[in-house]
């Protein structure tokens, strides 16, 4: 059955317009770029097959446009649209930092860290420095390591924060394994950072752990109290 034969409220485009993009599954979102699908399949089934054979979503979409266009069901036009959409999303997240806007939306900050760190093959620990109105001052990657971890030095975070005259910081690091669940070591280093920054009256607002899917916020877990 072609998508045009589906009930209107189940078609990906109509569903997105009526209920927003978050209401769609990964396959439904991808189907919007796929278009008509392969012969004998609707676009959603083609998208499901792409995710099954070449997914999950992150490594699939991390491919350059030239690699995407070779996948069954995409082709040059769909690959270019996907690459352009991803780049627009990245620039949108960057724009708030470049304009020095107040960062009051934690999910957006988490997505920004994810854009910067998720594709790394080794662990990277980064810090976003903020002024007293929670406007971005700078973003720095302070520590790098191996696939198993990076050594974090709270004193260096404090030194850089003082250098930027920051009133608050948000930190984040990636898990190359793809599992974003914070480890005991992650919680321990967060406590050390809290204690060190508190000595110089700088707030640690959040610590994001980046892996596959949604970034994990330690503040949301109540682990920064």
UniProtKB/Swiss-Prot annotation:
One of its GO terms (biological process) is proteolysis. PROSITE patterns: MPN, UPF0758. One of its GO terms (molecular function) is metallopeptidase activity. It comes from the Bacteria. Disulfide bonds: none annotated. Keywords: Hydrolase, Metal-binding, Metalloprotease, Protease, Zinc. A motif (JAMM motif) lies at residues 173-186. PANTHER family: DNA REPAIR PROTEIN RADC (PTHR30471), UPF0758 PROTEIN YEES-RELATED (PTHR30471:SF3). This is UPF0758 protein XOO0462. The lineage of its organism: Bacteria, Pseudomonadati, Pseudomonadota, Gammaproteobacteria, Lysobacterales.
